[in-house]
Amino acid sequence: MSNSAKSPSGPVGDEGRRNYPMSAHTLVTQEQVWAATAKCAKKIAEDYRSFKLTTDNPLYLLCVLKGSFIFTADLARFLADEGVPVKVEFICASSYGTGVETSGQVRMLLDVRDSVENRHILIVEDIVDSAITLQYLMRFMLAKKPASLKTVVLLDKPSGRKVEVLVDYPVITIPHAFVIGYGMDYAESYRELRDICVLKKEYYEKPESKV
C-alpha cells in the first residue's frame, strides 16, 4: 500500500522524500543533517564541560536569522540530549539582498535583547561562504564582552572565503553551490524544504522569477 500524499512542495513518495521542482539535486538530506548535528553536539558538550554550565550560567545559542532558525532548534535539542543547558537569543545581520552574491556591506537588522556580558556565546549560522557577515558578527559580539565566543556553522563553503574567519564547529563542508531548504532561502522562498537542495540556475539567472 502506498503512503503517497500531497503537500505544497509536491508529492511525497514511498520513501517519504519530496520532489522539489526547483531543485537541481538534493545535496544533504534532513536525516544526514540530524546525524551530523548530533555528532557536533557531542563535540560541543565535551568542549564546554570544563565551563561548568548550569541553568543560571547556560550556553547562549545566538541564532542568526533568518536562515539558521531550524538548525538552531535542532542543535538546541541535541545539546539538551547531551546535558548542556542552553538559552536561545536572536540576531539578524545580512550582506545579501535578494540575489545570490554578497554585497560586501553588512547591515545589522536585529540585536540581542539581553546582556551577554560574561556569558558563553555560540554563534549559530546556517552557512558561511564569504565569511563577511560572520566576521562582522564576531567583532560585534566581542564588543559586548562575553566570557567566551565560538561559532558553529551548519554548511561551510571554504572555497567562497573573502575574509579569514575561524569556524570552531563546521558541521558539514560543501562545494560551491547556491543552496536552499532547511531554513535557507532564495528571495524568502524555500525555507520550508526538509532537505538541503541545490537551486536550479534557471530560478535565479532568468529575469522572470519562478519564485
UniProtKB/Swiss-Prot annotation:
GO molecular function: guanine phosphoribosyltransferase activity; hypoxanthine phosphoribosyltransferase activity; magnesium ion binding; nucleotide binding
Co-factor requirement: Mg(2+)
Co-factor note (free text): Binds 2 magnesium ions per subunit. The magnesium ions are essentially bound to the substrate and have few direct interactions with the protein.
Main location: cytoplasm
Key words of the record: Cytoplasm, Glycosyltransferase, Magnesium, Metal-binding, Nucleotide-binding, Purine salvage, Transferase
Protein name, as recorded: Hypoxanthine-guanine phosphoribosyltransferase
Active-site annotation: D129 (proton acceptor)
Top class in the EC scheme: transferase
Homology family: Belongs to the purine/pyrimidine phosphoribosyltransferase family.
Gene3D superfamilies listed in its UniProt record: 3.40.50.2020
Keyword Nucleotide-binding appears in the UniProt entry: yes
Organism, scientific name: Leishmania donovani
Protein's job: Converts guanine to guanosine monophosphate, and hypoxanthine to inosine monophosphate. Transfers the 5-phosphoribosyl group from 5-phosphoribosylpyrophosphate onto the purine. Plays a central role in the generation of purine nucleotides through the purine salvage pathway.
CDD domains xrefs: PRTases_typeI (cd06223)
GO BP, one annotated term: guanine salvage
SUPFAM superfamilies associated with the record: PRTase-like
Protein's cellular compartments: Cytoplasm
Segments for region (Disordered): 1-20
Catalytic activity: IMP + diphosphate = hypoxanthine + 5-phospho-alpha-D-ribose 1-diphosphate; GMP + diphosphate = guanine + 5-phospho-alpha-D-ribose 1-diphosphate
GO cellular component: cytosol
EC code(s) of this entry: 2.4.2.8
Binding-site residues for GMP, renumbered to this chain: K66, E125, D126, I127, V128, D129, S130, A131, I132, T133, K157, D185
Binding site for Mg(2+): D185
